[in-house]
Amino acid sequence: MNTSPSNIKKACLVFGALFVLSIPIVWISLFFTTYHGDLTRIGKWTEHDFSWQIPQPAIHSSLLQSSPIDQADVLVIGDSFSETLHWQSIFTKDQIKVTTIHWGQIDNICENFKDLLKQNGFKGKKIIIQSTERGFKNQLEKSSNCSHGNLFPKRLERSSKAQAPLLNPRLEFNINGQFTAGFKTILNSLAIRASDQYHFLYNYRSKSGHIYKIENGCAYFSNRLCEYGLFFHEDYKKPSIDANLVSKVRDINRRLSDYKVSWLVIPNKSSIYHRPVSSEFWEDLEQEKLGPNLYQLFQEQKILIKDLYAPNDSHLSTNGYLLIGTVIKKHIQ
């Protein structure tokens, strides 16, 4: 094989050029894939653009506790909005013991659920059932159609970590991120600044997260790109909660007739900031004293509490959690 010095030199130059070009590619892939919020993660947006800039209150770790069920005064059944134990801290601060069960830990609220509670030692008299607009109909109908359930968690005592008062979206080394995620993230950040029409193209292509311009967005959010809001794509594919579902709420309450039951149904972030929905369900819920009207409350409080929902996430901020904790505590008492 004839390899002249000139060919070797050319090969070295090509290899060297590829190596130099690969450095920024690898750097972007490794350092632009650290996400703190679920909407920045699925949508590939930077925390630099969408993390909040106003400090949130700190919750002491001693308040983020789920008690053993046989010691609990209050039982909470909920989803990811309850899993962090943030809003329950309003109760634990007043020495009220709370046990929190995730929907996925039980066979829904079946007809024999009251018996399961007694068998597992629950002596309290108050139950809070938390759900979100997005999943409420499915959870309620599954419970209504369930006559007998066996699944019940054996250990409920646990603790949680407080949300950071202020995120520091510095570059972090992350080898677990997808190799292309860094490119998509930095591309989105550059494109949204270069064109105020980019969000139309982004939403057309995205099947996970959506981004929309929000009227008076900077009055509601503190993040750097506060004129935009991040939301779940699926919110725009499903109708809101039908007011007729209140009858099924009453049916579930009859199953739990030995207890004082309050329903905490949290609106989707998109329903508060962007997507118009009917408030009739929440109005009926409040009128029949089944639960607070969080839709009306959030519409009022989003003006007073900047970052009521976290800009980078579909969940509430710490201020938002403390608000619903205060409201539901007052309602159930």
Report each predicted region and the residues it spans.
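Extracellular glycan-modifying ectodomains
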Residues: 1-333
